[in-house]
Amino acid sequence: MLYIHKDSMAKLAMFAFVYLFVILCACQGYSVSWGDASYYNQIGNVCFQTVLCVIAVLAFMYVKEDIFNIFAKIHLTKKETWIVVAVIGVLFFAFIGVVTVYRYLTYSNSTFDFGIFAQMYEYMKQKGTISTTVERNKLLSHFAVHFSPIFYIALPIYFIFDNAITVQLIQAFMVAIPVIPILLLCKHHKLSNQMAIAVSLIYVLYPATAGGTFYDIHENCFITFFLLMLAWAVEKKKNVAAVIFAILSLMVKEDAPVYVFILGIFFLFSKKDKKRGVILIVASAIYFAMATAIVNSYGLGIQEYRFGNLYFTQDGGLIQVFETLLANPGYAISQIIRNTNDNSMDKIGYIISMLVPVAAVLFTTGKKYSRYILLLPFIIINLLPTYLYMHDITFQYDFSVIALMMYAIILNIADMDINRAKKLATVSVIC
């Protein structure tokens, strides 16, 4: 056995070994078969990972004072903080880039959906139109399926590097770059340099952040950065920047206005900025009506069937979804935990995966209940439907929710005393 003279060093060594053991167990958990031919436990691995989080947190609580004493001796300047966050972003970009490019080079991508976007970018380069022959087995504009003009913003890069690998790296870049608005928001709310780095780590280590890239590029990957920049611009009262990032957010997809609308509602009811909140609400409602009208009139129609469990007739639509929410809220609430089928537990696993890692900093709003408004899309868009992929962290449907969650987390941490903030933020980083 090793003899370590100082008790604090012994504690830190213990924590390091425990945390390494937890990480190895977590990796092994993904290769374990949680059942047999007759029964498969869909949340076995999720529950296993949760238990590992508890073990890691208990180990941290035992050594937290020693860890905090070490970090208290580290004093970072503003410039050094930016450098550290930049390094975090670059490493995250490299990780996502390597994983997704490896998927492409090893023929692990599927035609649906990576083949669609790889062909679409080549068609954009050659013809200027956002068309594919893959998406619906005929030459068709992607606008017929999703109204996503945001794809054009990355076209200049594809002109220079016209390769399918570039398409994957565009996604990696857009998912890594939100560390910039996260740092800007942290500094605006006067979080310490170390706390700003911790929040950046919470973002990049959050399971759904990297998980959302594992089904390859989708337009959703653009929105995290734009929504966070929009929140920052509104808080700083930078009108030009707010307009630019609001427009860019809306351009991501026909359902993107929902998230801008929620931001507007939050600014209105939290009394942060009623005027700009109302503007966001009105602008997003108008854009939503326009985008859905375009897809419905000139395309194949918006994919409202994903909310089919809220229809009361077979050929329902969004109107019936709203009617169900208003007329039968009890039924609507029951759908939040209703799984895809009777033998599935996908929503339970999804809720655990999304909430456990950030619960320590997400549900500490005190009496500022308006912040829970930022969680409404998580409930309405991801949990209400029984469409399987909407509540799966390995698909792209969480990027908008992640942006709103990170914003709420920053607001919550800003209201905490320094000791509580350090403890809870570190717990979230560990998980």
Report the location of each language-model feature.
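Hydrophobic, aromatic-rich transmembrane alpha-helices
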Residues: 1-2, 335, 346-372, 376-379
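Start-transfer (signal-anchor) and selected internal transmembrane alpha helices
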Residues: 1-98, 193, 276-279
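Hydrophobic/aromatic-rich transmembrane helices and adjacent perimembrane loops
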Residues: 41-53, 372-420
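Extracytosolic helix-loop segments that constitute the early lumenal/periplasmic catalytic or substrate-binding loops
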Residues: 116-141, 149
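Transmembrane-helix motifs of polytopic, lipid-linked glycan transferases
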Residues: 165-190, 229
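Specific aromatic-rich, kink-prone transmembrane helix
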Residues: 181-184, 202-205, 220-246, 263, ...
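Membrane-interface alpha helices of multi-pass inner-membrane proteins
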Residues: 199, 228-233, 240-268, 282-286
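Short acidic/glycine- and proline-prone juxtamembrane loop motifs at membrane-interface regions
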Residues: 211-220
